[in-house]
Amino acid sequence: AANQHLCGSHLVEALYLVCGEKGFFYNPNKVGIVEQCCHKPCTIYELENYCN
Protein backbone atom coordinates (compact mmCIF):
# COMPACT_ATOMS: atom_id res chain seq x y z
CA ALA A 1 0.00 0.00 0.00
CA ALA A 2 1.16 3.50 -0.76
CA ASN A 3 2.09 5.88 2.01
CA GLN A 4 -0.65 8.37 2.74
CA HIS A 5 -1.02 11.67 4.52
CA LEU A 6 -4.02 11.24 6.80
CA CYS A 7 -5.33 14.01 9.02
CA GLY A 8 -8.38 14.52 11.20
CA SER A 9 -11.48 12.62 10.06
CA HIS A 10 -9.53 10.92 7.26
CA LEU A 11 -7.20 9.47 9.85
CA VAL A 12 -10.12 8.22 11.97
CA GLU A 13 -11.78 6.64 8.91
CA ALA A 14 -8.55 4.89 7.96
CA LEU A 15 -8.25 3.50 11.50
CA TYR A 16 -11.82 2.16 11.32
CA LEU A 17 -10.97 0.40 8.06
CA VAL A 18 -7.65 -1.01 9.26
CA CYS A 19 -8.68 -2.01 12.79
CA GLY A 20 -12.26 -3.12 12.18
CA GLU A 21 -13.95 -4.72 15.20
CA LYS A 22 -10.78 -4.55 17.29
CA GLY A 23 -11.25 -0.84 17.58
CA PHE A 24 -8.39 1.59 18.02
CA PHE A 25 -6.74 4.05 20.34
CA TYR A 26 -7.04 7.57 18.98
CA ASN A 27 -6.01 10.51 21.09
CA PRO A 28 -5.40 13.60 18.96
CA ASN A 29 -3.65 15.27 21.90
CA LYS A 30 -1.04 12.55 21.94
CA VAL A 31 1.55 13.32 19.30
CA GLY A 32 2.17 9.78 17.97
CA ILE A 33 -0.24 9.04 15.15
CA VAL A 34 -0.69 12.62 13.94
CA GLU A 35 3.09 13.06 13.75
CA GLN A 36 3.38 9.74 11.97
CA CYS A 37 0.46 9.96 9.53
CA CYS A 38 -0.54 13.60 9.12
CA HIS A 39 2.71 15.58 9.17
CA LYS A 40 4.45 12.73 7.33
CA PRO A 41 2.83 10.00 5.24
CA CYS A 42 2.38 6.62 6.91
CA THR A 43 1.69 3.03 5.90
CA ILE A 44 -1.12 0.61 6.74
CA TYR A 45 1.33 -1.22 9.00
CA GLU A 46 1.97 1.91 11.02
CA LEU A 47 -1.78 2.44 11.39
CA GLU A 48 -2.15 -1.11 12.71
CA ASN A 49 0.09 -0.17 15.64
CA TYR A 50 -2.77 1.98 16.94
CA CYS A 51 -5.39 -0.79 16.94
CA ASN A 52 -6.46 -2.14 20.33
Curated annotation (Swiss-Prot):
Q: Would you kindly state one Gene Ontology biological process term found in this protein's UniProt entry?
A: glucose metabolic process
- Its chief place of residence is secreted
GO cellular component terms attached to this protein's record: extracellular space
User: Record's superkingdom?
Assistant: Eukaryota
Disulfide links within the chain:
7-38, 19-51, 37-42
Q: Name one Pfam family in it.
A: Insulin
KW Transmembrane (keyword) present = no
Q: Which Gene3D superfamilies match?
A: Insulin-like
CDD domains associated with the record: IlGF_insulin_like (cd04367)
User: Which InterPro entries has this protein been placed in?
Assistant: Insulin, Insulin-like, Insulin-like_sf, Insulin_CS, Insulin_family
Localization, UniProt: Secreted
- SUPFAM superfamilies (alphabetical): Insulin-like
Transmembrane among the record's keywords? no
One molecular function GO term is:
hormone activity
Q: Which UniProt keywords apply?
A: Carbohydrate metabolism, Disulfide bond, Glucose metabolism, Hormone, Secreted
Stated role: Insulin decreases blood glucose concentration. It increases cell permeability to monosaccharides, amino acids and fatty acids. It accelerates glycolysis, the pentose phosphate cycle, and glycogen synthesis in liver.
Assembly and oligomerization = Heterodimer of a B chain and an A chain linked by two disulfide bonds.
Q: Which family does it belong to?
A: Belongs to the insulin family.
Name recorded for this polypeptide: Insulin
Tell me the classification of the organism that encodes this protein: Eukaryota, Metazoa, Chordata, Craniata, Vertebrata
